[in-house]
């Protein structure tokens, strides 16, 4: 694993639990927030590419990656708690500069909820197949997720058989399917029943209607997104993602019409794996074109890549 993940491991004791994070390089902070059933491994290539010029901070959510895997008696596994954890980590690391926020999957909800608490701390946004709002118009909640979220058989498949992580690793890349070694690395933190409770709780915590835990918080985040309309933003999107599909991309574009958009027609959910050789240079160029010492201006709008 060390050849694929060549980083120093750091831990913060948070409410009695070990919270793992990467803290690489120096310079303007870039904070990368992963989703489910992923972990900081997803950002490894981007972290390596940026750490010579930036301070790269990448946490593993509690219950994920190399962080501790508690039971329900020791952790709430709630959306709000995830935001509180990220808040505590950045406070612990004394991050006082404005940050670049990179988000994927659940990381969009968590990261943008943090941003909503401290809008003045956010300098640039990198959006990767994610959301920070309720289901967009025209999008139905996928049946496979509904089964995992709401049924006993779904609980069995996700928790007992690890099918959520296993299938995500198999279908998350379309252009460049993951090798066996990569699939193994993505699933390694969740190799026992006790280690994969977070993958189940994340799915069960998806708020779909008023009264669901976290629904009001997502509503607050959604309602405050216009505060970030003038920030530099780049969006890299795998169009073959069956969850975060064209409807979600269209909603990002509606809310942020000045964002750069790079759509990849042949790529899936794990866009940093599927099109790493294109997406990482795009992000590097975006950061170079929008330095933090320059006045904040709207990003030039761009159409999806012609070759996507």
List each language-model region with its residue ranges.
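N-terminal cap/lid segment of alpha/beta-hydrolase-fold proteins
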Residues: 2-18
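Active-site loop/oxyanion-hole signature of alpha/beta-hydrolase fold enzymes
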Residues: 14-15, 22, 58-103, 281
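Conserved HGGG/HGGXW glycine-rich cap/lid loop of the alpha/beta-hydrolase fold
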Residues: 22-69
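The conserved beta1-alpha1 loop
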Residues: 33-35, 104, 237
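Conserved hydrolase catalytic core segment
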Residues: 97-139
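Helix-rich cap/lid subdomain of alpha/beta-hydrolase
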Residues: 137-201
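Conserved serine/cysteine hydrolase catalytic core
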Residues: 195-254
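Catalytic active-site module of serine/aspartate enzymes centered on a nucleophile-bearing elbow/loop
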Residues: 259-308
